[in-house]
């Protein structure tokens, strides 16, 4: 096999690591200074995130970004570990929204609660983020939103996830890690890829929007300045 074949096999092995598996089987408690836990974990994350750019995954991103770009208003929902991912989506997408479109974080942990979705309907889009074990609230809210005509985009970890069956477009990411916890790094990367593609499809000058926003925040004294 050629180098690229071997590289592909190695990357796949890293991506498919089971959550909770020790950083390197066969390495004792003292570890191996030549093959550190930090290096193995970093390699795994790099392979998982890199796989998001493969053709099949890229097509999923493009389809989902098209739905986001055409949306009237955007909402994001995620519980527990998925909450920071949905919050990051709202923060990034708010730069693209402009004055004519709202981007709202909803859910039990969000200031808006679920009330913001009461009047959501056709033309609106909800990003629902959920990994196994799936939160009942996320599933129920996504299902009800779809019934109201809201387009649901899911970021989840399996093609048989309950969110996949509800969503109009789905981004599959892995949450496996080389340690004891589920990794959300690929989900964060997915949000940023979606934002970049949505900016392109919206034909929005995102850099100018960010500049304007930061200038406004600076005028309100949001940013720290060193003492003179």
Where are these regions (language model features)?
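Conserved active-site and cofactor/substrate-binding residues in soluble primary-metabolism enzymes
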Residues: 40, 44, 56-59, 63, ...
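A short, amphipathic alpha-helical segment
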Residues: 11, 15, 195-199, 203, ...
């Amino acid at each position: 096999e050629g180098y690229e074949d071997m590289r592909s096999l190695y990357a796949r092995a890293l991506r498919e690591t089971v959550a909770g598996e020790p950083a390197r089987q066969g390495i004792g408690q003292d570890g191996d200074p030549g093959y550190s836990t930090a290096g193995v974990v970093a390699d795994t994350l790099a392979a998982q995130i890199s796989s998001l750019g493969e053709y099949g995954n890229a097509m999923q991103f493009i389809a989902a970004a098209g739905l986001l770009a055409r949306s009237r208003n955007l909402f994001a929902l995620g519980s527990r570990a998925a909450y920071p991912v949905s919050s990051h989506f709202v923060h990034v997408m708010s730069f693209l929204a402009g004055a004519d479109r709202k981007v709202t974080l909803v859910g039990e942990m969000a200031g808006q609660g679920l009330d913001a979705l009461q009047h959501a309907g056709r033309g609106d889009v909800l990003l629902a983020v959920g990994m196994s074990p799936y939160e009942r609230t996320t599933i129920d809210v996504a299902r009800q939103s779809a019934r109201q005509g809201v387009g649901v985009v899911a970021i989840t970890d399996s093609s048989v996830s309950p969110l996949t069956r509800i969503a109009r477009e789905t981004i599959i990411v892995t949450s496996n890690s080389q340690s004891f916890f589920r990794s959300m790094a690929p989900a964060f990367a997915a949000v940023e890829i979606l934002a970049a593609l949505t900016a392109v499809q919206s034909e929005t000058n995102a850099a100018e929007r960010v500049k304007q926003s930061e200038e406004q925040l600076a005028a309100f004294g949001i940013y720290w300045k060193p003492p003179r």
